[in-house]
Amino acid sequence: MKKLSVYLKRYTAQSILAPLFKLLEVVFDLLVPLVVARMINVGVAGQNRGVLVQCFFLLIAMALLGLACSITAQFFAARASTGFAADLRQAVFDHIQKFSFTELDTLGADTMITRLTTDINQVQTGVNMGLRLLLRSPFVVFGALMMAFTINTKCALIFAAAIPVLFVVVFAIMLVSIPLFRKSQAALDRVTCLTRENLTGVRVIRAFCREEQSVEEFDAANQALTRLNEFVGRISALLNPLTYVLINIAAVFLIDRAAIQVSLGSIAQGDVVALNNYMLQIIVELIKLASLIITLTKSLACAGRVAAVLEQQPSMTEGTQTISGSDSREAVAFHHVTFTYAGAGAPSLMDISFQAKKGQTIGIIGGTGSGKSTLVSLIPRFYDPQEGTVRLNGDDVKQFSRAALCAQVGVVQQRAVLFQGSIRDNLRWGNENASDAELWEALSAAQAKEVVEGKPGQLDFQLEQGGRNLSGGQKQRLSIARALVKKPEILILDDSSSALDFATDAALRKSIKHLGYPVTTFLVSQRIACIQQADQILVLDNGHLAGSGTHQALLESCPLYQEIFDSQFPGERLAAKEAGK
């Protein structure tokens, strides 16, 4: 929580005023039993009606002043806690944006969503209640004790004996609860992860008739969370009954001792009522303190999880250079690159070296899991290789700022991702200042012009979240158009035309080849037909570069490429040989 307290600095005044007004409220509360005692001792016993009326209006005034202090304290506490939560949430979100894909893969999207929402909301609740009650409850308890000593020392000793026992019970339960609340939040992460996984993959689950297994898996995780919460709840539930039992025992001793003191004439009946009122105040405040401790325990556990995100340092150090024009003909070069994903047992890429000249089209092909997507993800520096270097225009990509790389490299990934809003808004992710003419130019090159023209409102057509109101092929073409809007020097198409038919795919490749500006294109595909016209083709096999060259050269020299070709064009290579004879 100490690390997060810096986000309260902007609200220092509110954080001081909230407990201050609560303490003022406490002062009025502690004076009430004394006024009641005076009403009984002087007004009732002495039959002094003037004192009764005076005390009556004094109690009303104190109640109104206490209410005003309470409302003011709540106002300042709410301002401080909501502002703190907003700043903290923004800080965590901004920090996540600095993460490389390595940290994003390690932490997981579901965990970060939980920490940005549920955890920060819980911390906000803890700050709000802490500002209002953390000082109030102990102040009432010790204030009531001091007031009891001013009335009668012997009776006050019962208070002095009961309070430490109550604190021991409360803090013992708190120490047991804190680790359990942390486990509960981890179990909640698991349930959130399964929920997200099942909702996003519902079509696949139904296609394979896996509904029953998904329900069973979710039920197991949900039951584990429920059992843990029930166990924590049972421990937390001990607070109220234990404190009530201890206070009631103390009350019995108090009444017994007070009765003796009254009979001896040491104290008046009104003083006994005041002592009992102070005991009741202690009961109420200790119950509040117990509830506060439960809330703070949850908040501290959540604060630790949020702080863990802020303490996670990005594994990449961002460069500062911009990508300027270079005399180098080399657009992209890999020099003995080896890359391993965090937690993976074996490298995904091993000793990869190649060069791509400016304006060339580079095809990348290989089996599933051969490292095709991993290779192209190193170019925009989504990841850093453990060995070797990746160069753009002759310079190491680590030297460039993220903004510079983003401006020069356009990436269209396997899964087309569109956002809720108009088509125009989505396309302008590539260039927020792009004119409509530039948008239509990119749409035409991506073979998406007819798609947009057929929609009501055309560029103003509203897309649903994730582009749910478009087909797979339409989403892919709009994603390609979005990348083309910023006119990148390097364009990466990571199997991004898999949902297109052969004719549309061929037209797309042709239009990209003849763009009005020079672009180095990387085409990742499972289909030889998509890459056979490339200037250079890279063949990957389990992370190794099995071959590189033109289509014809690989047909003659690369067994793996020959195997892939024969599987997609059976008999064609043999027929060509026969025709050559």
Question: How should each PLM-predicted stretch be described?
Answer:
Residues R10-A13, K98-T102, T118-L131, L135, ...:
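An intracellular "coupling" helix at the cytosolic face of ABC transporter transmembrane type-1 domains
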Residues Q47-Q54, A61, M147-A161, F231-R305, ...:
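Helix-loop-helix
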Residues L20, L24, F28-V32, F57, ...:
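Hydrophobic alpha-helical transmembrane segments of ABC transporter permease domains
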Residues M1-T12, M112:
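A short amphipathic helical element positioned immediately N-terminal to and/or at the very start
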Residues K9, S15-T72, F76, F149-K154, ...:
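Transmembrane helix-loop-helix hairpins at lipid-water interfaces of multipass membrane proteins
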Residues V92, I96, I205, T226, ...:
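Helix-loop junctions and hydrophobic alpha-helical segments within the transmembrane domains
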Residues G325-K581:
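ABC-type nucleotide-binding domain
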